[in-house]
Structure formats: C-alpha cells, structure tokens
Amino acid sequence: MASRSALTLSALRERIARPPRAWRNRIWAHRARLGGKPDVAEAMPEPVFLGDAGRGEELVAGSWRALGQSVAVGRASIWTAPIPDPRLEAERQACLWLDDLAALGNAAARVLAQAWVQDWIQRYGSGAGPGWEA
C-alpha cells in the first residue's frame, strides 16, 4: 500500500499535468482562432424555432418587435437601435429575429441578416459584451 504522501504527490502530479478547464477552453479558443476558416459548413443545423415572415417584413421595413414592444431600427443596424427596456437586450442578443428574416426568405431579408450578423461580429466578436454574459 502506498503512503499518504505518495498518493498526495501522485494526485498533485496529475493535477499539474492536466490544465484547469478555464485554461483548456482558452487554449482551444486560441487554436480555433489560428486555424483556417472552413469554406462551407459541413452540416447545417435544423432551426430550433420557426420564424415569422410577417415579423421578417417588419424588420426589413425598419421595426423590430419583441416582448410586446416595438423598437424603431430604421435603416441602421439592430445593434445601434436604442433599447427602451433592459430586458430587450437579451432578446436582441438571442438573435431570434434572424429566424424571422430566414422565414421571409427574400433578398432584402438575406442582405439585412448578413449585415446585422457582420455588425455583431465587429462589435462583440472578441468575446466581450452583452451577448457573452450569462
């Protein structure tokens, strides 16, 4: 039977050899950033929610509706629209509006969706901001 100090040293050695989860996640994220970008997604995930084409038309017209409130977006990005209720920020970050634009499915909806997603990447793609807070 091994002594207690030998077991402690063995456990310590294992712990040191295995990086903490937070460090592993950072290392994996860093490796992903250094890797090449895929040309296309291998598999497209099925949508969890089906969007509403009527709400998609409202978005293209410049109005975003969530939680029973309407927010004027105009021709600007959804990310620059002033939010009157703090609860709306979580709705905006959830990107359910993207499902509505997909349900509409026309060229205007596609252009708007691409522009807003690109704007989100520019603003929050570094891993900081309201979309990253749990």
Q: Over which residues does each language-model region extend?
A:
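Extreme N-terminal leader/anchor segments
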Residues: 1-74
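Aromatic-lined, polymer-binding surfaces characteristic
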Residues: 85-134
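Large, well-folded core regions of big proteins
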Residues: 79-82
